[in-house]
Amino acid sequence: MAAMDPRNNGNVAPLNERERAENLEVREVVEVQDDQSVVSLMSNDSDLQKKMMKKEEKKNGGWTNAIILLVNQGLATLAFFGVGVNLVLFLTRVMGQGNAEAANNVSKWTGTVYMFSLVGAFLSDSYWGRYLTCTIFQVIFVIGVGLLSFVSWFFLIKPRGCGDGDLECNPPSSLGVAIFYLSVYLVAFGYGGHQPTLATFGADQLDDDKNSKAAFFSYFYFALNVGALFSNTILVYFEDKGLWTEGFLVSLGSAIVALVAFLAPTRQYRYVKPCGNPLPRVAQVFVATARKWSVVRPGDPHELYELEGPESAIKGSRKIFHSTKFLFLDRAAVITENDRNGTRSNAWRLCSVTQVEEAKCVMKLLPIWLCTIIYSVIFTQMASLFVEQGDVMNAYVGKFHIPAASMSVFDIFSVFVSTGIYRHIIFPYVRPTELMRMGIGLIIGIMAMVAAGLTEIQRLKRVVPGQKESELTILWQIPQYVLVGASEVFMYVGQLEFFNGQAPDGLKNLGSSLCMASMALGNYVSSLMVNIVMAITKRGENSPGWIPENLNEGHMDRFYFLIAALAAIDFVVYLIFAKWYQPISHDEDSIKGGSGGSLKKTVSELEQV
């Protein structure tokens, strides 16, 4: 690759081969204390420099810290689902909202949770770093759960024990409603803001071994479901009995313990410095491309500009090899006569190949990411329409009453079983790629929607006139929950690995947040679909719509089948983009920029002699 001398005021003035050979004969011996030995290093020995840096990075970290972060994830998830899993029933029973309104509000809230992940990822990658980002947002999360416990106790649960499905609550005051929404959106901000960063921070604790990091992401999702298991059984049961405040207080305690566990090993964590704001870097590529639109791209990518030596031009990032996608962006790395004539280089006119490839990576990931949104529409039904569907079914098994929200325990058990089957039976022999696993997850998700639609058809057939609940047992919902759980193992764990592994070093948190951003848009799309479907299908009293206040008068089965049909179309589009996708290729012999300046500086100075 063509090189620009970083010590020559940004001028493009490459040395000829003879001068370079003469300069490189000069050696500077650097004495480095390593335990009890003294090692002499040559200033141009990039391999040894890289090993020194990696050894320095690996002093801390390890699986012990990673396990602590998994515990933190489980406890934080317990607290989060203690709020979220029964939120739709809290809105209908305590806040007095209708089914469609409550389902929409839950979808919007859940979408906001995951949309805030982009905020956390940006702050982490650009300014705060992973540790500080996780700390700040977990503190916000604790404040939100605490405020929710307070407003429930003093404003909303009136009289005591109301909201159990039998005893109605008094209409909430305006102040109570305001504090309630403030608290739940603080919960959304705090939990969503730190989730993707926590996943990346956990991966940072491990060495650069793909299998170790793949195992961590599987355990990360496993820990999430362990925390959700307690919330979806014990907490849901008490909240279903009207003990809402007590359930929120348990969530508060879990959130506090999670924060303490996270802070405990602060000195033992392995830290990765933020790489700076990526937005200007990406924008520079497009601006430079536009300014050089008439420039002819060279046939040989080695003629494009790249920083010479092992160090990357982007702080905290390895070099990225040239790719054959979006070749028009290569113009940003073409060295023109204006760049060679001695004028000062302009970052908005000339970009390195690594910087161009960083922008290409973002563009290559977007089509894959967009195809995951419909799956998130499938997933979000579990927290809204699945619960409302179960609430109008026969929830008794003998004399034992099963809360509708507790049916998600079958989703969790399905995740446990599917994770074990995948890690110990499928993976050792087949080892499907992340893209293959995501496609499998989408297919299973379609099957879940079909199962939910068939269950709804049977539920409507067993409705007794004048009764709210159908005679169909709630156990008919088991297949749809099990299928959603199995699909998660393939889709969401695959997404975590794919977006984290394919994101450039300077955008790792953004890569992890794309998974949660997909969930966010999935919830918003679900809410939009409900509104559109109700607007089209509601025709007065004789046609109350597919999802009316009284579900026995609607056709929620058709809504499930609509989602399945859209997901099938999405799967075809996904196959096209998955086949088109070209993986990122890092230069493993390169050094993360901004971290090895001393030795590099010596070589640069010698080259100017």
UniProtKB/Swiss-Prot annotation:
The modification Phosphothreonine is found at T133. Its main location: membrane. This is Protein NRT1/ PTR FAMILY 7.1. The gene is NPF7.1. GO terms for molecular function: transmembrane transporter activity. It comes from the Eukaryota. GO terms for cellular component: plasma membrane. It is a multi-pass membrane protein. The chain crosses the membrane at residues 67-87, 109-129, 136-156, 173-193, 216-236, 243-263, 367-387, 402-422, 438-458, 474-494, 516-536, 559-579.
